[in-house]
Amino acid sequence: MLTVETLERPEAATDEWLRLGVRIVVTGRGGANSQTVLQQVLALFWPVAELYDFYATPYPRLPDATVLRIAFDLPAGYEAGVSGIVQSIGGAGWTVDIYEDGEQAACWKPEDGAVRPLCDHFHSAEINLIPSSHLAEFRKSAAPRLLQ
């Protein structure tokens, strides 16, 4: 079972925010590798984002692999965008897409010349940055309150 330890922070409500969704495939038996990657990702984004949700499931395409799905809520004023997120995670070989509607995405796969981000257990990843106005109403009402 994966665990998360976070510090208490004062919160203030905002009307607009960004949902950061991170989906990472982690290799290796047991939960140790997944726990390590989860803690690394939390350390990268906890200073600027609120943890919304996370869970892990087996990855059916690769034996002994786990899919980590981690969601954060960022203040609307977060200007670094998905490119800044990719830079924080590191590695090389990311494919970044920025759409006209404000959504942003990035993908990393172990292909020619790609430099693995975070650790050797990092198999692949997808990142999505979605404005709160694009989320379904039930997702908006469940959102945590964010720092101003």
For each feature predicted by the language model, list its residue ranges.
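Short edge beta-strands and adjacent turn/loop segments
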Residues: 7-18, 48-63
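Long, low-complexity, intrinsically disordered polar/charged segments
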Residues: 25-26, 33-46, 55-73
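Charged interaction segments
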Residues: 44-48, 62-148
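Short, extreme N-terminal segment that most often corresponds to the first beta-strand
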Residues: 1-42
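Generic marker of "main functional regions" within proteins
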Residues: 36, 51, 55-56, 99, ...
